[in-house]
């Protein structure tokens, strides 16, 4: 899978999630608000993203009803490692190991790789920042996990592995 930056304007940014030659989802971020609109085969959703914390920053995602769905936390700013909590489950991630531009998501014990996703098409802005929370990385990661781990997307999760 890979994220592709489609359009970056003054008022919005649009990204697409691709698996091979098939578009899986489209997400558009409003630069004026903290909301994002997601369109996928699962329907249309609106998520809100909040940055929290000072010494240990994290990004929290809430659904359209304001209910917390999950969060991303970076182990150390600039480390490219951290954890994702989504629907009560914990996952660990490593981003850009060996300058690959790819993210690998593991189970809680780091025994099994659950998915790999390329951020090469959107990582120009990621390389210029000290923390992964200075850009849309955490939001894209949360949407990627949400999409992949939908209960009715078992075939999508198997295709990713």
Model-derived features: where do they sit?
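Low-complexity or membrane-interfacial segments used for flexible interactions
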Residues: 1-35, 41-46, 75-161
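Short, well-structured hydrophobic secondary-structure segments
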Residues: 35-65
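Helix-adjacent hinge/juxtasegments
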Residues: 57-85
């Amino acid at each position: 899978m890979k994220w592709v930056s489609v359009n970056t304007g003054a008022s919005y940014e649009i990204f697409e999630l691709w698996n091979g030659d098939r578009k899986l989802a489209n997400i558009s971020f409003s630069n004026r608000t903290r909301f994002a609109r997601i369109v996928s085969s699962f329907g249309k959703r609106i998520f809100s993203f909040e940055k929290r914390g000072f010494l240990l920053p994290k990004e929290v995602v809430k659904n359209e009803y304001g209910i917390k769905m999950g969060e991303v936390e970076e182990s150390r700013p600039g480390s490219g490692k951290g954890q994702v909590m989504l629907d009560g489950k914990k996952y660990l991630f490593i981003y850009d190991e060996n300058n690959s531009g790819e993210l690998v998501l593991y189970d809680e014990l780091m025994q099994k790789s659950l998915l790999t996703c390329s951020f090469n098409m959107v990582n120009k802005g990621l390389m210029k920042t000290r923390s992964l929370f200075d850009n849309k990385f955490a939001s894209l990661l949360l949407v990627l996990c949400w999409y992949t781990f939908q209960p009715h997307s078992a075939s999508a999760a198997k295709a990713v592995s």
